[in-house]
């Protein structure tokens, strides 16, 4: 029997994927997997360990047999060394990078806005070549950001992720096109280095072979060969077989090497006087010098592989060689001639074919380590320039490595990368799954990658070589579709940056447990069978003809003797988020894409609930995401409280695990951990001690299991609207906690220092009631918009004093300085409870930006119940907005009186073809009620239950079920189990074997005319909450030039009354309504103040004036030198001067309206 664990926990297996103490989940899986899911964060952590040359990485490399490889930092220092001065009399070299301890813990860094980093030291050796004197020193190279064990970086207190980049691998690429005019076949080849100049060869429609160096003008290829020192005889000897190359040679009239060199120089450097020496140096520098040209190990490997050059030897030369160029040309002419095979002198035979640049053999991954390494290379090369200059200016005797080195450019380069690079992103912390997916993301965008505009359809499309490497389903909708992907579950990245996926070896028709990781190139050479091919107990295929796939994704039936490999697992091709969709095989791909993406937008609820119907992936995903706490050593739980768990390990050591309590995530959701173990309980290594957000008993739990009826209801769930029961509001089933951070700082200004104080001018005592003596709000205070969180005053400019005031000052001394209120207030539309305050002050030696004396952060939490307008979704792309919340007594109910929780419309299913949601609903009901399969007297099972594992024949109520992707419950099994569900306590079975029940109308008590599908579906509350979107404004800020209200909630803007809305008003002839919309409600500056005055005084609304936008139009026409005048009805010119300013100022001052743009005048301010 083949060994290997079944996917999820069943009653016999103690654990799933090696995690002890896992909750029980009954699984439908029928295929055994010989391989555990690898660490889901390895793509990040392994790469960073390579960069810093960590011990664990060295051990892994040695186990793989890569003993010669050095770490990323060592590589780059070796590449830089030695730095020589211009005369070559002295040199500086670097070696042995090493790190000190990290300065502060991750929590401290987040709290104090610090970067989680360790000091980097290198050994620098200065050699004076004239005297032979060597000076060696340890040099500090700046603080180097370190990766946390969760694969993230903490930069200035915020958690960030560096996304892996998909780029075209260095190497040679052959291409084929057809000439539009002559319909001739044209072939071309590009030699793409890791860095340096491109070299391109092509055969044009006149059948001549040409070359372009560094994207300059085309020349005959024989010119380049002659420039490399080849004589006409040598060229004829090597390429005599090719007519087109011989024809090119005849047309080329350069005499010898010197003339060819000059010819190339003229094309590359037009306008400079060519000499033989400068031409020779130019060509050398372009392709044959380490400093200027680098193929990288991967480029050398690809070129050797493609052209069949010295394949056996280790990879050494990182520059081009003459043989590379000649072999490339030969390959090109053979490709044009239609040959199928080529053997380079001293090399091995390779097939001659064009390349597909979207193939994963030609696209590689730049992971974190390499991206940082490239950035450090930039910084070091800037530093190298400084070192050279200092070598020439400083006194040779006094020079030490320390005096030569300036680390600023290196530190700046690293800072720039983490702070501003497109690939260093603010981590998505909506829930554990979104964080995990973010770390496994593959992006084709970014520096050195594609841009959205230039990327065509081919790059974005699903390619056969993505299988098992990049998920074909999980990608964003919109402009980035296909450019951003997600790593498949079992994929890993090899040292060259190519993505590998595991396969089981098949020998003579027998499947072994030997697992080989193959790159896309290697996989093309083999015949691969699917994971669900039927096997017998010895691993032999049971069918005569087996469905396999060959190169290019073609499928066919072959005999078992021809098969080389077999898939490791049915979920090999999908990513983690996609692998968490049950019945994925019954969903249309477009909807599955939405389902995978929407799981990442799930908001952590107050109480998490694991899904009744899962896929067996929930536990591993939650544990690897790192938001749950796992035991580091086997032992016994000694003490448990809400804040920490202490474990006494078997070796006598104690470890205290601290919980994160109600912390704010990057997205403003609430990250809270709580223990799930008891005192005295024995815990194994790797067991879950505490749940985080969106987890239950260590399993990912993004939503809730709700009783759903799938039916239309009075048209209230038309167009994907959702009807909910009031119970979900009252019992806080879909309630989430959101935490906002508000920050204010007190700075030094030109007029004096700002001050955080309780003493605010012109403010009533009620407003200050919740502030403490410092002027900061107390913890636990309930606040709503406009309330003061932190009192602050700013000095105002001294005004001209009247003689009376001056006299009073002279008598009574210095009067209190004029200050204005610049307190931190709760933004418009937000409410909540203050749960935390952090005060940083210069006096306490806190690290603050220059000019800032004090910084206060206030955390306000709000509990958001579910309400109309919030967005809910299932896992199958079935999303909708809540249209109505019905009282519990009006909801349809089952025959035993149970009201349903949620009503979804039937019309959302057929056209979208996501039938998975219906199957999930049925299986959810089966799991909730429990089941018992009737076994005949002779022990035989019903036909549908033949395939079921033994422990699946019966289960109690509330059983969690796993139905793995592509290996889940079959339709006949569902029908059979629906007929075997356990009765309720009255002995009745509510739902028939077709999955439908007779529902009764809650309002009338009458049964609905048709049976309705009822069951349990996993429903997720998404981050699109109506509270964050709803917005209203009376008065507020105006745009500087047009004087119209700003737009958008963030700017506290108004609602736009656009062109089409105006047409609607015109159609109804609503002239006066339209006039006030376009003038006094918008940009008639004087009019709107007068209207406000009239409303306050209870007078009639005055006549509208001239809108500001009309004045702007006039000015724009005048700026085009057009003389535009405004005429009144009697033909007299009207002056459009801003003559009304005085009236405006007077009216505004009387009303206390602030007309400056910066501070929004709210109604509350005016009331004060």
Swiss-Prot record:
Alphabetized UniProt keyword annotations: DNA-directed RNA polymerase, Nucleotidyltransferase, Transcription, Transferase
Annotated catalysed reactions: RNA(n) + a ribonucleoside 5'-triphosphate = RNA(n+1) + diphosphate
Sample GO molecular function, one term: DNA binding
Family annotation (PROSITE patterns): RNA_POL_BETA
Enzyme class: transferase
Pfam families, alphabetized: RNA_pol_Rpb2_1, RNA_pol_Rpb2_2, RNA_pol_Rpb2_3, RNA_pol_Rpb2_45, RNA_pol_Rpb2_6, RNA_pol_Rpb2_7
EC number(s) reported in the record: 2.7.7.6
Database matches in CDD domains: RNA_pol_B_RPB2 (cd00653)
Cited InterPro entries: DNA-dir_RNA_pol_bsu_ext_1_sf (IPR042107), DNA-dir_RNA_pol_bsu_external_1 (IPR019462), DNA-dir_RNA_pol_su2 (IPR015712), DNA-dir_RNAP_su2_dom (IPR007120), DNA-dir_RNAP_su2_hyb_sf (IPR037033), RNA_pol_bsu_bac (IPR010243), RNA_pol_bsu_CS (IPR007121), RNA_pol_bsu_protrusion (IPR007644)
Transmembrane feature ranges: none
GO biological process entries: DNA-templated transcription
Domain of life from the UniProt record: Bacteria
GO (cellular component) term, any one: DNA-directed RNA polymerase complex
Similarity comment text for this entry: Belongs to the RNA polymerase beta chain family.
Known role: DNA-dependent RNA polymerase catalyzes the transcription of DNA into RNA using the four ribonucleoside triphosphates as substrates.
Xref: HAMAP family: RNApol_bact_RpoB
NCBIfam families assigned: PRK00405.1 (NF001616), rpoB (TIGR02013)
Subunit structure: The RNAP catalytic core consists of 2 alpha, 1 beta, 1 beta' and 1 omega subunit. When a sigma factor is associated with the core the holoenzyme is formed, which can initiate transcription.
Protein name according to UniProt: DNA-directed RNA polymerase subunit beta
Organism encoding this protein: Rhodococcus jostii (strain RHA1)
GN (gene name): rpoB
């Amino acid at each position: 029997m083949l060994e290997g664990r079944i996917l999820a926990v069943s009653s016999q297996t103690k654990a799933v994927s090696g995690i002890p103490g896992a909750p029980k989940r009954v699984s439908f899986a029928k295929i055994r997997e010989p391989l555990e899911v690898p660490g889901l964060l390895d793509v990040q952590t392994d790469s960073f360990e390579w960069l810093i040359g960590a011990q664990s990485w060295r051990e892994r490399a040695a186990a793989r047999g890569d003993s010669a490889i050095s770490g990323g930092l060592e590589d780059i220092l070796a590449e830089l060394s030695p730095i020589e001065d211009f005369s070559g009399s002295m040199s500086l070299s670097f070696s042995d990078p090493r790190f000190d301890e990290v300065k502060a813990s991750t929590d401290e860094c987040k709290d104090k806005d610090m970067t989680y980093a360790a000091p980097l030291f290198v050994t620098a050796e200065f050699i004076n070549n004239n005297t032979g004197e060597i000076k060696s020193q340890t040099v500090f190279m700046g603080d180097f950001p370190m990766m946390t064990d969760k694969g993230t970086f903490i930069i200035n207190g915020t958690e960030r992720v560096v996304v892996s980049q998909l780029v075209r691998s260095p190497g040679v690429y052959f291409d084929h096109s057809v000439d539009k005019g002559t319909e001739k076949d044209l072939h071309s080849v590009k030699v793409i280095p890791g860095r340096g100049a491109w070299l391109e060869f092509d055969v044009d429609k006149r059948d001549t072979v040409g070359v372009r160096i560094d994207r300059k003008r085309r020349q005959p290829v024989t010119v380049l060969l002659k420039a490399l020192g080849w004589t006409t005889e040598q060229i004829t000897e090597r390429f005599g077989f090719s007519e087109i190359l011989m024809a090119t040679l005849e047309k080329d009239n350069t005499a010898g090497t010197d003339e060819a060199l000059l010819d190339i120089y003229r094309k590359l450097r037009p306008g400079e006087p060519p000499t033989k020496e400068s031409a020779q140096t130019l060509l050398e520098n372009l392709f044959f010098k380490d400093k200027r040209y680098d193929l990288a190990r991967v480029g050398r490997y690809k070129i050797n592989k493609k052209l069949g050059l010295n394949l056996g030897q280790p990879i050494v030369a990182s520059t081009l060689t003459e043989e590379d160029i000649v072999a490339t040309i030969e390959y090109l002419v053979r490709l044009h001639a239609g040959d199928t095979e080529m053997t380079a002198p001293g090399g091995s035979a390779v097939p001659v074919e064009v390349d597909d640049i979207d193939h994963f053999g030609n696209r590689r991954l730049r992971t974190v380590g390499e991206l940082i390494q490239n950035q450090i290379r930039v910084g070091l090369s800037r530093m190298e320039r400084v070192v050279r200059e200092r070598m020439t200016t400083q006194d040779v005797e006094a020079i030490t490595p320390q005096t030569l080195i300036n680390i600023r450019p290196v530190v700046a380069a690293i800072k720039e990368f983490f702070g501003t690079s497109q690939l260093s992103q603010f981590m998505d912390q909506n829930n554990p799954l979104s964080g995990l997916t973010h770390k496994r993301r593959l992006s084709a965008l970014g520096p050195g990658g594609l841009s959205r505009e230039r990327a065509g359809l081919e790059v974005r499309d699903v390619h056969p070589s993505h299988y098992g490497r990049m998920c074909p389903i999980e990608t964003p909708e919109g402009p980035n579709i296909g450019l951003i992907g997600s790593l498949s579950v079992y994929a890993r990245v090899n040292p060259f940056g190519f993505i590998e996926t595991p396969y089981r070896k098949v020998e003579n028709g027998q499947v072994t447990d030997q697992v080989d990781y193959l790159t896309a190139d290697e996989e093309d050479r083999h015949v691969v069978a699917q994971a669900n091919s039927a096997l017998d107990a010895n691993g032999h295929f049971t069918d005569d003809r087996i469905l396999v796939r060959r190169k290019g994704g073609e499928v066919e039936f072959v005999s078992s003797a021809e098969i080389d490999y077999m898939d490791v697992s049915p979920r090999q091709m999908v990513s983690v988020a996609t692998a968490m969709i049950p019945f994925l095989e019954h969903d249309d791909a477009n909807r599955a894409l939405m389902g995978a993406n929407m799981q990442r937008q799930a908001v952590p609820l107050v109480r998490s609930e694991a899904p009744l119907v899962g896929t067996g992936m929930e536990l591993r995903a939650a544990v690897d995401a790192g938001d749950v706490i796992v035991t580091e050593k086997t032992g016994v739980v000694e003490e448990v409280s809400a804040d920490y768990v202490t474990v006494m390990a078997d070796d006598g050591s104690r470890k205290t695990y601290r919980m994160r309590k109600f912390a704010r995530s990057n997205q403003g959701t609430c990250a809270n951990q709580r223990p799930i173990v008891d005192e005295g309980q024995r815990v194994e290594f790797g067991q879950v001690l505490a749940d985080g957000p969106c987890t239950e008993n260590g399993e990912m739990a993004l939503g809730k299991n709700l009783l759903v009826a799938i039916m239309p209801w009075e048209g209230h769930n038309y167009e994907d609207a959702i009807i909910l029961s009031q119970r979900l509001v009252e019992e806080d089933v879909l309630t989430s906690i959101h935490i906002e951070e508000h920050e204010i700082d007190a700075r030094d200004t030109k007029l004096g220092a700002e001050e955080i104080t309780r003493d605010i001018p012109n403010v009533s005592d009620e407003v200050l009631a919740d502030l403490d003596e410092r002027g900061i709000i107390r913890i636990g205070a309930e606040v709503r918009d406009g309330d003061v969180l932190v009192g602050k005053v700013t000095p105002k400019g001294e005004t001209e004093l009247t003689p009376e005031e001056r006299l009073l000052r002279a008598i009574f001394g210095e009067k209190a300085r004029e200050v204005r209120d610049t307190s931190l207030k709760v933004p418009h539309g937000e409410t909540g409870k203050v749960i935390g305050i952090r005060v940083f002050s210069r006096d306490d030696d806190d690290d603050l930006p220059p000019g800032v004396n004090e910084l206060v952060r206030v955390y306000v939490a709000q509990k958001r119940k579910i309400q109309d307008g919030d967005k809910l979704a299932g896992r199958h792309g079935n999303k909708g907005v809540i249209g109505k919340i019905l009282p519990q007594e009006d909801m349809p109910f089952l025959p035993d009186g149970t009201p349903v929780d949620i009503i979804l419309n039937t019309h959302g299913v057929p056209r979208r073809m996501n039938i998975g949601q219906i199957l999930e609903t049925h299986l959810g009901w089966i799991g909730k009620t429990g089941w018992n399969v009737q076994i005949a007297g002779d022990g035989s099972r019903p036909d549908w239950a033949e395939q079921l594992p033994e422990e699946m024949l019966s289960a109690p109520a509330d059983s969690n079920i796993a139905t793995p992707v592509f290996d889940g419950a079959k339709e006949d099994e569902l029908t059979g189990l629906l007929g075997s569900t356990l009765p309720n306590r009255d002995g009745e079975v509510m739902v028939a074997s077709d999955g439908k029940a007779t529902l009764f109308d809650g309002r009338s008590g009458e049964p609905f005319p048709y049976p309705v599908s009822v069951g349990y579906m996993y429903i997720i509350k998404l981050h699109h909450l109506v509270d964050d979107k709803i917005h209203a404004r009376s008065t507020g800020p105006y745009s500087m030039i047009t004087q119209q209200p700003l737009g958008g909630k963030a700017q506290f803007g108004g609602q736009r009354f656009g062109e089409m809305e105006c047409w609607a008003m015109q159609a109804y002839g609503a002239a006066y309504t339209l006039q006030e919309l376009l003038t006094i409600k918008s940009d008639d500056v004087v009019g709107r103040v007068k209207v406000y005055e009239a409303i306050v005084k209870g007078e009639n609304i005055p006549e509208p004036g001239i809108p500001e936008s009309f004045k702007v139009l006039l000015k724009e026409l005048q700026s085009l030198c057009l003389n535009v005048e405004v005429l009144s009805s009697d033909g007299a010119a009207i002056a459009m001067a801003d003559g009304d300013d005085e009236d405006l100022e007077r009216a505004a001052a009387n009303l206390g309206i602030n007309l400056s743009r910066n501070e929004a005048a709210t109604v509350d301010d005016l009331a004060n």
